[in-house]
């Protein structure tokens, strides 16, 4: 996967964790 996609997924995961 492109590094950009990895960063997007990582950021999304962090945002989801913050919502919990």
Curated annotation (Swiss-Prot):
Location relative to the cell: Vacuole
One GO MF term: serine-type endopeptidase inhibitor activity
Superkingdom of origin organism: Eukaryota
GO cellular component: a single term: vacuole
GO biological process: defense response to fungus; killing of cells of another organism
Residue runs in coiled coils: none
Keywords: Antimicrobial, Fungicide, Protease inhibitor, Serine protease inhibitor, Vacuole
Family stated for the protein in its record: Belongs to the protease inhibitor I3 (leguminous Kunitz-type inhibitor) family.
Function noted in UniProt: Inhibitor of serine proteases chymotrypsin, pepsin and trypsin. Has strong antifungal activity against the human pathogenic fungi C.albicans TIMM 1768, S.cerevisiae KCTC 7296 and T.beigelli KCTC 7707, but lacks antifungal activity against the plant pathogenic fungi C.gloeosporioides KACC 40003, C.coccodes KACC 40803 and D.bryoniae KACC 40669. Lacks hemolytic activity against human erythrocytes.
Protein name: Antifungal protein J
């Amino acid at each position: 996967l492109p590094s950009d996609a990895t960063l997007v997924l990582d950021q999304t995961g962090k945002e989801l964790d913050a919502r919990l």
